[in-house]
């Protein structure tokens, strides 16, 4: 049976969701390089957080706001702008249209925006799977470990970059 599981993973249609890899969050080179290794292997989408106080009260409530015009730092196939923690409905619809059986998720703010993306994908009937060594956390836990623990608790599916590349 283990061989059948391994074989089914190899044949699984996958897509990559890159969350908030943008200048204001200062992604390290290792994160950009790791994501770059996945971009050539599967369809990809990215989210970018931009500020619109009329939609999301970052400044009023948190005393911080993302930039008005930040850009994506990776060459994803499609980039979707969001104004809060969750990915947009259009992004989720696009992933559905790709008919991905599993959505690999990586990026910045593992304990907030990445986790929120996991909830949105899960609720949409997709299979969110975190690439656990391709995340950074928020200012609360820059290591990303808190986000990985929360993801494991809520969704169970965490893989490493090496595991994805080995498939």
Model-derived features with residue positions:
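Active-site-adjacent betaalpha module
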Residues: 2-15, 24, 41-43, 57-167
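Short hydrophobic beta-strand that contains or immediately precedes a catalytic carboxylate
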Residues: 17-19
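Short acidic, Gly/Ser-rich segments with clustered Asp/Glu that frequently serve as metal-coordination loops
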Residues: 21-30
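Short beta-strand segments at enzyme active-site cores
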Residues: 45-49
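Transmembrane alpha-helix/helix-exit interface in multi-pass inner-membrane proteins
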Residues: 51-53
């Amino acid at each position: 049976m283990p061989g059948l599981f391994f074989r089914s993973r190899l044949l699984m249609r996958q897509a990559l969701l890159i969350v908030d890899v943008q200048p204001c969050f200062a992604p390290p080179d290792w994160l950009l390089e790791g994501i770059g290794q996945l971009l050539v292997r599967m369809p990809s989408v990215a989210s970018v957080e931009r500020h619109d106080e009329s939609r999301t009260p970052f400044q009023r409530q948190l005393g911080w706001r993302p930039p008005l015009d930040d850009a994506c730092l990776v060459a994803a196939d499609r980039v979707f702008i969001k104004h809060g923690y969750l990915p947009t409905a259009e992004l989720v619809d696009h992933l559905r249209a790709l008919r991905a059986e599993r959505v690999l998720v990586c990026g910045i703010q593992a304990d907030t925006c990445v986790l929120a993306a996991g909830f949105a994908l899960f609720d949409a009937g997709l299979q969110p799977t975190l690439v656990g060594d391709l995340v950074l956390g928020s200012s609360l836990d820059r290591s990303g470990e808190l986000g990985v623990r929360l993801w494991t608790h809520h969704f169970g599916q965490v893989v490493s970059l090496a595991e994805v590349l080995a498939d």
